């Protein structure tokens, strides 16, 4: 059976880790490289590094931070933000990223996912989906550009399409739950996880350790991502994993 992954997320703006509520009201949470080193030592299964304003501000990835983060960490690192071309992916992989997350560019041009997967392999291509529930309906709309731009695109249909084009993993964030500490959007997570055949990382809304368990058990995700509960010292990675083991989930535990 697969091992459940616990993934801290470093949302970075202007070279600092930040944490917001519903993608706004950003709060400083420290230096990204220092945070990465701490999470690596704490036993995180992976690290997700997202330059959250790169696409919106039309600028490139902070490659120096990416390089220093990758050099400091032994765990796999996924990097995203402002990834628009095959050359962007190549540069990130050469800088030390293990996987690259594509968001707005995948929505704008689906074939980009296919090109990337064919060139680098689907194992390192992650498509990030930021979704928001359509009021009064059991449907979710995709937003792009750091959650600033609605698209009218159905999140479930989009997930199925990008997987058919070669996406090896989906990083799914509920904009409604992001930063609220009220738990994952389980109907959204479950709907997408049950509709595709690749791993789904649940993101957005973790406020306690039971929420992590819920994402796997009820959301059918294969990995869970969290930020604020780890960044501000409320829980450690080991506490999270120990709790999940007690709840019967298969985890990788360091000695």
Swiss-Prot record:
GO terms for molecular function: imidazoleglycerol-phosphate synthase activity; lyase activity. One of its GO terms (biological process) is L-histidine biosynthetic process. It is found in: Cytoplasm. Its main location: cytoplasm. Keywords: Amino-acid biosynthesis, Cytoplasm, Histidine biosynthesis, Lyase. The active site is at 11, 130. HAMAP family: HisF. Heterodimer of HisH and HisF. PANTHER family: IMIDAZOLE GLYCEROL PHOSPHATE SYNTHASE HISHF, IMIDAZOLE GLYCEROL PHOSPHATE SYNTHASE SUBUNIT HISF/H IGP SYNTHASE SUBUNIT HISF/H. This is Imidazole glycerol phosphate synthase subunit HisF. It comes from Rhodopseudomonas palustris (strain HaA2). The lineage of its organism: Bacteria, Pseudomonadati, Pseudomonadota, Alphaproteobacteria, Hyphomicrobiales.
